């Protein structure tokens, strides 16, 4: 299945009150996953394309029709153009006030970390998939995604695995500690050394590793750190990355979504 879980969906898994959105335009479901009948899988490393069809009992196959559609090069392309000014749901001062409030909660010990977001709005004309293609070119991260759900689209580029469950093992790769790439190897090495010794970046990384261990331990045993504060180089930045893994309890009887529910 493919889809998403929003932050507000925490209300279904934990006893945490969540305020409903006051934005009438924000009517996307909080959780949406789809089992697609047809998949087209691209393997860029092998220059291969695989067509997958989920075929029910007694259903005819349409894989040949999909293959013909894939080979049809007669398609229309559309440009993308921003229209008007960029706006936000929060003013600069409102956002700064939220930051000050978040810092106060951290100092009181109410929370370990708060991730404050701010929505920006930009009207446009044309095909937003063109914008996604530009993002993919500028920031080629391990997790690139574009979902067209009809009434809304979601796309982005992320280096981070929230949780991976494979062959009886669940893993989380905490990423915290970031600095820029310079384009010069020696300068990048110096920036990496500075990153590894930066007290603030290291404190944040240790906190996320501890959170990952705690989250996995809620539903796994043999939770441990596989590697710790490994510098990883991306197109524009250098990240510090660790890996925490564990074995889900009664894995043969446990579905993946039950492990994810605890994360």
Language-model-detected regions and their locations in the chain:
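Extended alpha-helical targeting/anchoring segments
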Residues: 1-255
């Amino acid at each position: 299945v493919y889809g998403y879980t929003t932050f507000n969906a925490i209300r279904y898994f934990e006893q945490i009150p969540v305020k409903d959105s006051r934005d009438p335009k924000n009517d996307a479901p909080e959780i949406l996953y789809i089992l697609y009948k047809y998949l087209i899988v691209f393997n860029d490393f092998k220059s291969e394309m695989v067509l997958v069809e989920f075929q029910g009992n007694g259903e005819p196959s349409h894989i040949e029709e999909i293959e013909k559609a894939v080979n049809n090069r007669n398609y229309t392309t559309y440009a993308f153009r921003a229209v008007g000014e960029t706006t936000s749901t929060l003013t600069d001062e409102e956002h700064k006030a939220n930051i000050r409030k978040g810092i106060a909660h951290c100092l009181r010990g109410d929370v370990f970390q708060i991730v404050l977001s701010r929505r920006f709005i930009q009207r446009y004309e044309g095909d937003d998939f063109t914008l996604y293609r530009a993002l993919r070119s500028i920031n080629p991260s391990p997790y690139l995604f574009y979902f067209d759900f009809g009434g809304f689209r979601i796309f982005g580029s992320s280096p981070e695995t929230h949780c991976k469950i494979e062959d009886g093992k669940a893993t989380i790769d905490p990423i915290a500690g970031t600095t820029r790439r310079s384009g010069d190897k020696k300068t990048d090495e110096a920036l990496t050394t500075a990153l590894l010794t930066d007290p603030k970046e290291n404190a944040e990384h240790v906190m996320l590793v501890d959170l990952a261990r705690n989250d996995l331990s809620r539903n796994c045993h043999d939770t441990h750190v596989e590697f710790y504060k490994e510098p990883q180089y991306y197109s524009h930045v250098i990240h510090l990355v660790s890996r925490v893994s564990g074995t889900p309890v009664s894995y043969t009887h446990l579905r993946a979504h039950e492990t994810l529910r605890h994360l």
